[in-house]
């Protein structure tokens, strides 16, 4: 997200924002306040989590992240499968510091 802001976009809507909207907003807010250092710190905090949830676990990961933060994610529709217990535990551990 921060790369896009550096290149001049006015905002961003990453898929991970569905799972952790506050954490994503904090990156944007720090950037808009002119605090690039804080924006980088906030981005670094969620980078690995976002990559795992979006790229490795996909839609099922995003939906489970939503459920963790008190939103309705629900089960993915077929042909996508729900996460395994191990995958859910991985997301819970990664998102521990990003819960709303």
Annotate each predicted stretch with a short phrase:
Residues 34, 57, 83-86:
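Short coil/turn linker and secondary-structure boundary residues
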Residues 5-9, 45-80:
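Conserved short secondary-structure transition element at the edge of the structured enzyme core
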Residues 1, 21-24, 59-65, 88:
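A general structural signal for well-ordered alpha-helical segments in protein cores
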Residues 1-54:
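Catalytic alpha/beta core domains of metabolic enzymes, predominantly
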Residues 72-100:
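Flexible C-terminal active-site loop/helix
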Residues 31-33, 67, 90-94:
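Short alpha-helix boundary/capping motifs
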């Amino acid at each position: 997200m921060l790369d896009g802001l550096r290149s001049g976009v006015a905002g961003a809507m990453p898929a991970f924002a569905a799972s952790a909207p506050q954490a994503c907003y904090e990156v944007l807010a720090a950037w808009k306040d002119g605090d690039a250092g804080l924006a980088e710190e906030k981005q670094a905090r969620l980078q690995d989590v976002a990559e795992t949830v979006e790229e490795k676990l996909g839609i099922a990961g995003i939906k489970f992240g939503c459920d963790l933060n008190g939103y309705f994610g629900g089960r993915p529709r077929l042909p996508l499968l729900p996460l395994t217990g191990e995958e859910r535990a991985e997301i819970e551990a990664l998102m521990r510091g990003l819960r709303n």
